[in-house]
């Protein structure tokens, strides 16, 4: 999604990220969006959260929504992890509802009914919580740091 208009700032205040975000008068938001035939715009993902696996794109948001539709899942975040053959693969980080006894295998079977086989995460990690910003958005950079402690062999780019 790119934006341009008189209401769009021409630069970030004292921020070196201006060069990446502002190009030729356009603000590159970092969002992936689709436009309906009626002209409505729907933001579907963030470019930094898309997972490129074997040349195909996997939406982390769609996987998160599929996982969170399971009745025993409280919340879920999906991140890309490096893979020697496929470049990146999804890793699901899941917080279960209190008292849940669902297993990885049961969650995978649940996902198999909802997404393409190549979208299935390589692993599911159960966590007590997913780090969030002050407004409740997932802090995926912090989540990657936490996951690297669990999987020290991973090197995030």
Residue ranges and their predicted role:
Residues 145-157:
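Acidic/polar alpha-helix N-cap and adjacent early helical turns
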Residues 2-5, 10-11, 20, 32-119, ...:
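AMP-binding/adenylate-forming catalytic core of the ANL superfamily
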Residues 25:
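FAD-site-proximal beta/loop scaffold in flavoenzymes
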């Amino acid at each position: 999604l790119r934006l341009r208009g008189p209401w769009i700032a021409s630069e970030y205040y004292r921020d070196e990220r201006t060069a990446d975000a502002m190009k030729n008068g356009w603000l590159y938001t970092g969002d992936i969006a689709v436009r309906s035939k009626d002209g409505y715009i729907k933001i579907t993902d963030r470019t930094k959260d898309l997972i490129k696996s074997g040349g195909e794109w996997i939406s982390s948001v769609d996987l998160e929504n599929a996982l969170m539709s399971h009745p025993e899942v409280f919340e879920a975040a999906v991140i890309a992890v490096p893979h020697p053959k496929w470049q990146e693969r999804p890793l699901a980080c899941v917080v279960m509802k209190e008292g849940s006894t669902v297993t990885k295998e049961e969650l995978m079977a649940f996902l198999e009914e909802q997404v393409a086989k190549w979208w299935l995460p390589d692993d599911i990690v159960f966590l007590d919580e997913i780090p969030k910003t002050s407004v409740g958005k997932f802090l995926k950079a912090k989540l990657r740091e936490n996951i690297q402690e669990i999987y020290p062999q991973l090197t995030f780019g």
